Amino acid sequence: MAIPTFTMRQLLEAGVHFGHHTRRWNPKMAPYLFGVRNGVHIIDLEQSVPMMYRAMQAVRDVVAGGGRVLFVGTKRAAQEKVAESAKRCGQYYVNHRWLGGMLTNWKTISQSIRRLKEMDEQLAVGEQSGRTKKELLNMTREREKLERALGGIRDMGGLPDLLFIIDTNKESLAIQEANKLGIPVVAVVDSNSDPDGVTFPVPGNDDALRAIDTYCELIAGAVLDGLQAEMSAAGIDLGAAEEAPEEVLPAEGAEQAPAQA
């Protein structure tokens, strides 16, 4: 395997170059803008292409070193693709709502994940657990709420080593927490985005479905290449496997120091 390749034409066809109306721009994005067309900022793809490759290389290197990547995209346009792509490459995701402290208060989050797993076990045996139907119904509702919030990280086993983010404005809290812990951030930055705090920015449209699909596919491909490198170093042929291998997780609740950029 190798890091996926792509062309500027592919980015154009996906609408990556379309920013927002000029009145909604963030002046910090000025260096990444090509110009204005019909009142809309046009993103400079001459910069987006090498910056995407740089971001993909960072993702690949983190994974090749045994690190974990957390995909974050809670806006409606990104939710499905973020989850799908993370699962495809054996990584983790948050696509419902970012809970405050999801990184900086990992101990409490771990307790909630443990509670989720306990409820799964209890609901599996149903009334044999000695609980009434009403108690089981209430537990089912609680479990569904926790699954929406934490289902994508229930098996992460510790802090991620890199975040991949769609929409820095919506996910500003995730970026703040990652910055506080020294976890590198790869993020798509639109013309109305704040690139501060993003280790590997990728200038591009963060609203169009085709654009979001493109970013997620490329990052997932970089993850898979990193897994191949990690497995090859261990003498395992990932190419012969149909799915990404399951990660060997540390003990429940154990924290892992994030990789530095």
Swiss-Prot record:
Top-level division of the source organism's lineage: Bacteria
Disulfide bonds: none
GO biological-process terms attached to the record: translation
SUPFAM superfamilies listed in its UniProt record: Ribosomal protein S2
Matching InterPro entries: Ribosomal_uS2, Ribosomal_uS2_bac/mit/plastid, Ribosomal_uS2_CS, Ribosomal_uS2_flav_dom_sf
One Pfam family, short name: Ribosomal_S2
Family the entry assigns: Belongs to the universal ribosomal protein uS2 family.
Name the UniProt record assigns to this protein: Small ribosomal subunit protein uS2
